[in-house]
């Protein structure tokens, strides 16, 4: 198999053999398009919600997710089946860097974009290093105990933001609770693809119930569809220019460490499902993700990462063809060029978004615990216990450190604190033999 060449995709139908379609195989055009729609739907919920939580344009973020996925496809030589969508890891640091209040468009979006570009640059450099020397150094620097602690700290750091966003009125608070229940019911009582799209389906159901409560029963502020009716079907999204603020860059750039760990985990999952060795492409995958993040941030989009939602779709369908993700990317780009679609997104009530954010931020925190469970992390070891305890409090309490005009926020201190504490506390006395047990004669 050529390292830098594109594969020769062989035509295959899902009706043949076991129905498994490998990354270097393809479906007929119609089936590829349908699978592309399915992957576009799978990424939709989070790719729309994350930029809204940061005050970015969701329409532009969807467009850039499609462009970023195509860039990733070309850089990896069409051999890694993945979709790049808006990353939740940026939410906390972008809000901290810009002081965004969670409503409307972020007035300090420019400095956030500069930080996203800086993060993408760090991400790309790490990818280039991985291409040269492999991933062992990353796994030693950030073992599962560190990765899990940092991911959980991010979720806990975001918790106050989610709660404050739904505290404007008693009605908003109850509608947020209703949204949480809608998503929870979808997660528990549905199966298959509907269950995998729990955020999207839950949002739709919650919006419908909110519309009934307000537009029909008059219990709250009615949803206004004027912008939707006046918006054009096709047009350019709103682009923004980045500004490079050193403090914002210092705060946002460390997210690259989380994205690297997340991407490596996703690639290992894909390798396990496809039976293909993805190690030769890990460096290029990181470079592709980093460049896509820089490109997105340069025009006003959010930082991107490979999506677990789409990995779940592959696990269900057994279709791993990389051409399916090209189709999904094209669909996302078409949606990004529709102002009417963007206007429809902006009709989602703030209370519904806040309720969804409670679930999403909670799931981020739980994902950290899942990393520990899956990797059998031993929290009975004092070194691990102290590192995790300190990391969680630094993140949840938004502990900040200021040095020479630079301020490192809670997520930054939690990330670097976890790495440093793990390096200091995980030492073992490997040269000291265990005490010898002497058996005395009776």
Give the role of each language-model region.
Residues 33-43, 172-179, 197-198, 236-266, ...:
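Hydrophobic, membrane-embedded alpha-helices of multi-pass small-molecule transporters
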Residues 2-81, 89-105:
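N-terminal signal-anchor module of multipass membrane proteins
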Residues 10-11, 16, 44-47, 181-189, ...:
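Juxtamembrane interface elements at the cytosolic ends of transmembrane helices
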Residues 15, 19-30, 55-73, 251-322, ...:
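Membrane-embedded helical hairpins/re-entrant loop segments and their flanking transmembrane helices
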Residues 53-56, 78, 99-107, 131, ...:
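Juxtamembrane helix-boundary/capping and inter-helix hinge elements in multi-pass membrane proteins
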Residues 48-53, 83-96, 265-274, 304-316, ...:
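Re-entrant/interfacial helical elements at transmembrane boundaries that shape
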Residues 1-34, 219-238, 272-275, 285, ...:
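Intrinsically disordered, low-complexity non-transmembrane regions of multi-pass membrane transporters
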């Amino acid at each position: 198999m050529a390292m830098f060449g594109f594969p020769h995709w062989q035509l295959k139908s899902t009706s043949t053999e076991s129905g498994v379609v490998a990354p270097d195989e393809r479906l007929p055009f119609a089936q590829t398009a349908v699978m592309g729609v399915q992957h576009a739907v799978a990424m939709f919920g989070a790719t729309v919600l994350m930029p809204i939580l940061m005050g970015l344009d969701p329409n532009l973020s969807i467009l850039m997710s499609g462009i970023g996925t195509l860039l990733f496809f070309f850089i990896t030589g069409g051999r890694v089946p993945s979709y790049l969508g808006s990353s939740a890891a940026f939410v906390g640091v972008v809000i901290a860097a810009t002081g965004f209040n969670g409503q409307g468009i972020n007035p300090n979006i420019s400095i956030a974009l500069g930080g996203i570009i800086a993060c993408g640059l760090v991400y790309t450099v790490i990818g280039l290093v991985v291409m040269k020397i492999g991933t062992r150094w990353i796994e030693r620097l950030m073992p599962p105990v560190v990765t899990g602690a940092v991911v959980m700290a991010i979720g806990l750091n975001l918790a106050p933001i989610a709660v404050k966003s739904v505290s404007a009125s008693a009605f908003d608070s109850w509608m947020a609770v209703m949204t949480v229940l809608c998503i929870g019911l979808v997660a528990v009582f549905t199966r298959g693809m509907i269950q995998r799209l729990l955020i999207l389906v839950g949002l739709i159901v919650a919006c419908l119930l909110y519309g009934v409560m307000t537009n029909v029963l008059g219990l709250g502020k009615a949803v206004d569809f004027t912008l939707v009716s006046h918006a054009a079907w096709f047009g350019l999204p709103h682009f923004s220019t980045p500004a490079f603020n050193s403090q914002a860059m210092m705060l946002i750039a460390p997210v690259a460490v989380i994205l690297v760990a997340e991407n490596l985990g996703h690639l290992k999952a894909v390798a396990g499902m496809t039976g293909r060795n993805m190690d030769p492409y890990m460096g290029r995958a990181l470079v592709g993700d980093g460049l896509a993040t820089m490109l997105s941030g340069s025009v006003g989009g959010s930082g991107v990462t490979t999506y677990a939602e789409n990995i779940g779709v592959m696990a269900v369908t057994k279709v791993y063809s990389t051409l399916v993700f090209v189709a999904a990317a094209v669909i996302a780009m078409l949606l990004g060029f529709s102002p009417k679609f963007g206007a429809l997104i902006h009709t989602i009530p703030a209370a519904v978004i806040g309720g969804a954010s409670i679930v999403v931020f909670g799931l981020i925190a739980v994902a950290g615990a899942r990393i520990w469970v899956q990797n059998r992390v031993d929290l009975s070891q004092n070194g691990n216990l102290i590192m995790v305890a300190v990391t969680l409090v630094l993140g949840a309490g938004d502990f900040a450190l200021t040095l020479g005009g630079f301020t490192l926020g809670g997520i930054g201190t939690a990330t670097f604190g976890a790495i440093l504490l793990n390096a200091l506390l995980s030492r073992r006395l490997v040269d000291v033999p265990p005490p010898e047990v002497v058996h005395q004669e009776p």
